[in-house]
Structures are given as C-alpha cells and as structure tokens.
Amino acid sequence: MSPLFVVLLIATTTFYHSDAFAVKRDHHMCDRTGKACLNNAECCRNEKCVLVDPNIRCFTVPCGTACVKR
C-alpha cells in the first residue's frame, strides 16, 4: 500500500464520519427555548431537537437527528 493511498483513505474516512458530512458547519443545534444544545441529551430533553440555520429559522426534527456537540 502506498503512503498516498493510506493518506487518502484516512482523509476520506474522516470526512464521511465527521458531522461536516451530515450537517453543514454553519448549522447548530438548540432546544425549543432557543438555547444552544451542549449534547444529545440536552437537545432531546423535550423529545425534539431544533436545527437553526444561519438565518435563525428553527424547525423541529426527530429526536437525535444531527444532535452533535458544537
């Protein structure tokens, strides 16, 4: 295995498993009150998570969806 192949494999794997692939970096999670979530449990305290886009429009998504530490 060439060193270049290994580097590409690691980079690709890291990219696909990072939250950057699932959620754009300019998005963040907050709970229903608009308070930013620190972790999945906090996001899901009210059984729903809220995804806030850069325009601060919130919409509910199923509990656990894209609830990642920011």
Curated annotation (Swiss-Prot):
Listed GO MF terms: toxin activity
Coiled coil segments of this chain: none
Expression (tissue specificity): Expressed by the venom gland.
Keyword terms: Secreted, Signal, Toxin
Secretion signal span: 1-20
One Gene Ontology cellular component annotation held by this UniProt entry: extracellular region
Subcellular location: Secreted
Name of this protein: Putative venom toxin Ts29
Annotated organism of origin: Tityus serrulatus
Lineage per the UniProt record: Eukaryota, Metazoa, Ecdysozoa, Arthropoda, Chelicerata
